[in-house]
Amino acid sequence: MPLRDKYCQTDHHHHGCCEPVYILEPGDPPLLQQPLQTSKSGIQQIIECFRSGTKQLKHILLKDVDTIFECKLCRSLFRGLPNLITHKKFYCPPSLQMDDNLPDVNDKQSQAINDLLEAIYPSVDKREYIIKLEPIETNQNAVFQYISRTDNPIEVTESSSTPEQTEVQIQETSTEQSKTVPVTDTEVETVEPPPVEIVTDEVAPTSDEQPQESQADLETSDNSDFGHQLICCLCRKEFNSRRGVRRHIRKVHKKKMEELKKYIETRKNPNQSSKGRSKNVLVPLSRSCPVCCKSFATKANVRRHFDEVHRGLRRDSITPDIATKPGQPLFLDSISPKKSFKTRKQKSSSKAEYNLTACKCLLCKRKYSSQIMLKRHMQIVHKITLSGTNSKREKGPNNTANSSEIKVKVEPADSVESSPPSITHSPQNELKGTNHSNEKKNTPAAQKNKVKQDSESPKSTSPSAAGGQQKTRKPKLSAGFDFKQLYCKLCKRQFTSKQNLTKHIELHTDGNNIYVKFYKCPLCTYETRRKRDVIRHITVVHKKSSRYLGKITASLEIRAIKKPIDFVLNKVAKRGPSRDEAKHSDSKHDGTSNSPSKKYEVADVGIEVKVTKNFSLHRCNKCGKAFAKKTYLEHHKKTHKANASNSPEGNKTKGRSTRSKALV
């Protein structure tokens, strides 16, 4: 193996002529040269570089260079300053005996050292600190250290120090104090604030030791508790900052500002090191998400994360306690969710919240580039749904109050009769067997309810528009949602609480109408309820690349069509009667039943396929749906013919068709 060696400044330069077997690597050119003499050398040269050098030179000296100290008497080298000091103390005492007094201000060497420290660690604050040392009775090798500012002597902070720490600090203040190991008298010294250590060593006293302070003093001590855990005495919850625990007590426990200090308990952090520094850097609670505890750099990033990720929760009233309890509503006021939901909408409609023409939100003073972005912001952040007719809000406040009441009104579970669900194109819309059977039982009651509503419809056309809207609102809610079963018939979703169903209804409401959102394929007439179905359809049927999908995906939301609930229910009613007439021949009503046959569910389930590389689908020319097997496609085409020739007369003459015959 060839020898890889670099030249040294003092070595004799062999050029490899005597040793042809080994190849020497050419050395670093500065190491081959003799040292250049400059006007200043040693520490003076470094000080001059920090005083008048470039930014790059300062960076090299601070970050990329290690210092080796050389004793001028014995030429010994030391990599650390403490080793050099110990060496000079015991083996090579300095040539000039220094007295114990402070150095003269006019001394050039001390002035140069001060300039060096000022250049490396520029002091932002010139405030002085007072250090008080108190002896410990049980331990003679350590003292209590109290640090306070001269401008505010009330704020006294306490930290314990190790013997090495106390020795260094006492040597700086006076040499006589360092010779006595047990400290008997308390001494007060005025020192300059160190750059980092004092800030991290500061810890706040407990609530018993600290006197009552003003609100300004409370705000200044927000970030001084990095080494301690703050505990709420009422619920024993831990916090990292005083601001977080004060906000928690004020919002959750409803305590006044004057009583906050009584409910805060301070406990030392167990993972704190011996010098008082915390091992883990604690992120302030105000910059972390209260739901998922993810930390961010700024509060604006926390708000943006909360609006986009946790969009179902209210940002202004959310707290970690309420967010983690599953059954408790997210409102801080102790009122029912239905009432609070209603009052919130009424309160929001009492004044102008937005300006559609200027695309500006008047609640948080934000301006947006388009009305779509403003509507999205109002729906996600403020939970206000805007429609095209909502721009008249500012002109007629009375009408807005009525319309908001109509929009929010939820019928009680006792008075609402449930009706069967509606079926759309989405293949995930198949029902569980229990839900399907339950809703088949409720079908006659729902149709009786429909007959009653039809008989009352002439009365609903009264001169007052608000009353008419209220009358027509009830059947729409009951047609799309089952408040007894807590079930959305449009999405086939079951909810655990009435509040969750109420929040879900907001997603289906636009002004005074209930709609169902459909995503449409931009290349054909295919449309579905789910966005991922459109993406799958474009990939499998139209054979488009992922690059094309990246362009199309953003516009799918804009192309989405909001169809009213009547359109969805009527569409299912057209598809269903031919099957329901055969199955329920004893029913007295004509084909208005919305419950479909299981045959159509099976046909829709057949379109869900697993795509592989060696795979070809059978596509329908009429609607663009693709099927894995040809039998599924032929069966699907029969449904098109059945829908085209669907009439009451044809249904009577037609025989009963079963699933086994259809699939043969």
UniProtKB/Swiss-Prot annotation:
Q: Which residues carry this modification: Phosphothreonine?
A: 319
SUPFAM superfamilies associated with the record: beta-beta-alpha zinc fingers (SSF57667)
One GO CC term on file: nucleus
Bias (Polar residues): 154-179, 207-224, 416-436, 458-470
Main localization, broad class: nucleus
**PANTHER family in the cross-refs:** ZINC FINGER PROTEIN 800
User: Record's family?
Assistant: Belongs to the krueppel C2H2-type zinc-finger protein family.
- Under which name does UniProt file this protein? Zinc finger protein 800
Protein source organism = Homo sapiens
